[in-house]
């Protein structure tokens, strides 16, 4: 019986050692599997897992959908890609741009996932045919953007691990 308890304890440590917390902002944290390769260039952080990779960037409203400067409407624009806002609030040309980008990205009602965790809106989609997906996390003042290339299991695991930070650093 002691052996089983010891084995369970050792295995539980191994599970915890398989990922690390990535603190994206004062409000957002997620568990990322251990990666042998982590690259950082400019505003992009890339994690490589064998044949899969995940990249993260903080969206710039001036650069996200170039040449349109989305400053002031960036969150509404991202929501509109997932058909969560009334596009009629946008000028006709911006509504058309939103619909075009949503279609280009391949966001459909069947492949999108939408969740609210605390003060975070988490919007994502995954295309199993191309084995790629994207996630947008709408934080209080930032929009985090993840791009996934790899299995739907990696996408689901990372998507489900996104959570609002309980401000453990601010106590």
Show where each model-derived region lies.
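A broadly tuned preference for mixed-charge, low-complexity surface segments
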Residues: 9, 38, 86-90, 94-101, ...
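Surface-exposed amphipathic alpha-helical segments
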Residues: 24-38, 140-171
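Boundary at the C-terminal end of the N-terminal hydrophobic targeting segment
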Residues: 17-19
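Beta-strand-rich N-terminal accessory domains
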Residues: 21-23, 38-40, 45-47
């Amino acid at each position: 019986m002691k052996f089983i308890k010891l084995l369970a304890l050792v295995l539980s440590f191994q599970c915890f050692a398989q990922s690390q917390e990535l603190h994206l902002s004062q409000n957002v944290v997620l568990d990322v599997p251990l990666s042998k390769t982590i690259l950082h260039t400019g505003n992009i952080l890339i994690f490589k897992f064998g044949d899969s990779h995940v990249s993260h960037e903080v969206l710039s409203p001036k650069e996200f959908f170039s040449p349109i400067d989305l400053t002031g409407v960036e969150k509404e624009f991202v929501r509109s890609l997932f058909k969560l806002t009334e596009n009629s609030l946008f000028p006709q040309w911006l509504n058309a741009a939103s619909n075009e980008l949503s279609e280009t990205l391949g966001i459909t009602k069947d492949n999108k996932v939408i969740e609210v965790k605390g003060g975070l809106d988490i919007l994502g989609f995954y295309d199993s045919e191309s084995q790629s997906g994207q996630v947008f996390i709408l934080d209080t003042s930032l929009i985090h953007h993840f791009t996934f290339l790899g299995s739907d299991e990696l996408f689901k695991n990372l998507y489900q691990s996104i959570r609002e930070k309980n401000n453990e650093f601010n106590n």
